[in-house]
C-alpha cells in the first residue's frame, strides 16, 4: 500500500482531501478528452485509409499511362517534354487546433497557366497527356492525404500522452491519496481514543484522591 509521506494531522488530512477532489476531477476531464481524441482519431484513420486507396489507384493509372507513353516515345523526347514545368506550385502551411493538437492544413498556391501540359503535342502521345492530366488533378488529394497522415500521427501521440496522464492519476496518485487519507484518519482516531482513555484514567485518579 503506497502512501504520501506527510504528518498525520488534521490540517494535512483536509489538504489531502482537497487534492483528492482535484485529482478525481482532473482524471474525469482527461478521460473525457482521451475518449474524444480516440473518436476523432478513428474518424481520421478511416478517411485516411479511403483517400490512400483512391490516390494509390489513380497513381497506378497514371503510371500505366506513362509507361505506355514511354513505349511509344524515345527517352530523349520524354525527358525534353518534362524538362520545363508549365506551372509553378507552392504550398501554404497553416495550423488547425483539434482538441489541443495543432494539425497542419496545406493550401495550394498555384500560378495560373493557360496550358496544363509542359510540352507541345507534335512528338508526344495521348498516354503522356493522360498521365500529366491525372497527376495534375491528383495534387489536391495528395496534399489532403499528407494532411491526414500527419494529423493521425500527431493525434496518436496526444492520445498516448493523455493515456499516460490518466493512468498516472488513476493508478498512482489517486490510490496514494486515498490510502494516505485512510491512514491519517485511522491515526487521528487512535490518538483521539488514547487521549480519551488517558483523560478517563486521570479523572478516576482525581476522584479516588
UniProtKB/Swiss-Prot annotation:
Record-annotated membrane-spanning stretches: none
Show the GO MF annotations: ATP binding; proton-transporting ATP synthase activity, rotational mechanism; proton-transporting ATPase activity, rotational mechanism
Question: What InterPro entries does the record point to?
Answer: V_ATPase_D
Q: Which HAMAP family match?
A: ATP_synth_D_arch
Q: Which GO terms describe its biological process?
A: proton motive force-driven plasma membrane ATP synthesis
The family line of this record is: Belongs to the V-ATPase D subunit family.
Supply the alphabetized keyword list. Answer: ATP synthesis, Hydrogen ion transport, Ion transport, Transport
Name the UniProt record assigns to this protein: V-type ATP synthase subunit D
* Function of the molecule: Produces ATP from ADP in the presence of a proton gradient across the membrane.
Tell me where on the tree of life, at the top rank, the source sits: Bacteria
